[in-house]
């Protein structure tokens, strides 16, 4: 029995530790243009032509776009059909359309058979039509790369989604390589590729398969081998040029298919059109699915105001590019949060703070002072909006597409990153810790149910910062809030760095529990002061005027064609590969979900590497993640707990495990 007790206690201790660990649910939102008016008719009149309003990849950053070829395939339109009024789109008035287009391979080499391929955006993902003239049979594009890879005899190159190629043999003398293509470890095809011939096309292996959605001779993989050579130890093949589709998960779209709220499917050759058979309501203060991960986000406004945007939610780990509206030509350009999805925006309060302008272009050169980034402090509502409890508004300032809080609400020179602004409910037991992100945490030192109090302790990287006993018995709702004020934050005193609102304390089945609703936190430990001589990438002329920060370029800034040029602090211009008579570019930032994935490093021809485990995914680029706290066990029925995703292991599981150990003990004793 002592042994069982020890095991049970160990299990309890282990699970208590795990219960305190945070588990962030990371989401990237890529939004389209912001539409603001009195009702849907007013918006169609203002932003459309009075009959129809259309967005495409040049202004909706989620849609597929090829800047070099200036290729878009997708549009989303709202048409003023009957019953389109107020906040309602009538039947057939919400129209998603996509058309097959030709784009160049990343490894562009027409002599080797690498010129163009057919592509179609499908709900903001890149798909390949199995038949290049018909839009009904699609397979997702996994890989289109011109990076160099080296692969040794017996080595495998992971292509993603379970696909791989292996170098079975590398014959340096014969200038050949034997490659094998597999899916989930199962053989698919193999080929001996010769690189000795003058015919560059012979260096390419096209894997063609039959019966892909009833289509034959479908190219599913293209591999171009540059050369084979003898390394210090191994025989090595160098690959430059990889293209792959996910043929194992190809699909055929039927006329009776449904995609979210889009359920009227029409296929006309190379064009796919899907509309709504039923009316579509833009419900205020809500997100309504359009289809396949596309949504409309609608602001919490009175009935005489309608404000919304289309957006794509991404939850898969990886790196993603969030771009602004595409600029074309040599005229002046400007972006704000309505035209650059990377900039900070609060749809409910219609608050944006950042602008980026380009003026007086000379060809592709921006003169001194012609590139200007400006941001101004604005007030927004707390997510937990409760003015009676001291939760009304706080000052915010976008800073290079990140959300920052001014230490002094009237001055833009001292800022700290916003870590958390949440109205979710969390339960926390005596001795339990709630991870707030970035090393910050709060712990319930004691929960006094009879006295209706909770003793909370605030820590940073495990070190004590402050503590407070919060009473929830008073009728004064503001007394339920703990404001942690610290001094000497960038030479400022009485700075509120954390706000916690405690709803109630109650007795659970075993533990005393406090319920928190309302959390707000800034990263004060990494606050910064912006000086007039600071430099931010190519922006180095800093001007601070009260609540406004302006940074411009002291030197000329060249929009070099076919390149990416840093603006500052992770913000870039992407410039198309065009002729000198044309100029096309957009600003972008990169966001990351999960652990940051390092980019591919090209292997110089003279020094090939043995690393071949890297895989190039589609449209993924580095990004920042805002961590959110983990919720504990749901409260009793009378208290609603939100955000079921990302919860910590519940105590029900813990006691279930202890019960299981008890059963094991009793069975063994009886035996």
Swiss-Prot record:
Transmembrane segments: 647-667
Listed Gene3D superfamilies: 2.60.40.4190, 2.60.98.40
GO BP field: cell wall organization
Bias type Low complexity, positions: 623-633
Ranges of compositional bias, category Acidic residues: 613-622, 634-643
Signal sequence extent: 1-24
Keywords assigned: Cell membrane, Cell wall, Cell wall biogenesis/degradation, Glycoprotein, Membrane, S-layer, Secreted, Signal, Transmembrane, Transmembrane helix
GO molecular function terms listed in the Swiss-Prot or TrEMBL record: identical protein binding
Mod. after translation: Glycosylated.
Location in or out of the cell: Secreted, Cell wall, S-layer; Cell membrane
InterPro entries: PGF_CTERM, S_layer-rel_Mac
Keyword Protein transport included in the entry's annotation: no
Main location: secreted
Region (Disordered), start-end ranges: 594-650
Positions bearing carbohydrate: 36, 70, 116, 350
Gene Ontology CC: extracellular region; plasma membrane; S-layer
Stated role: S-layer protein. The S-layer is a paracrystalline mono-layered assembly of proteins which coat the surface of the cell.
Family membership noted in the UniProt record: Belongs to the Methanosarcinales S-layer protein family.
The protein's name: Major S-layer protein
Organism field: Methanosarcina acetivorans (strain ATCC 35395 / DSM 2834 / JCM 12185 / C2A)
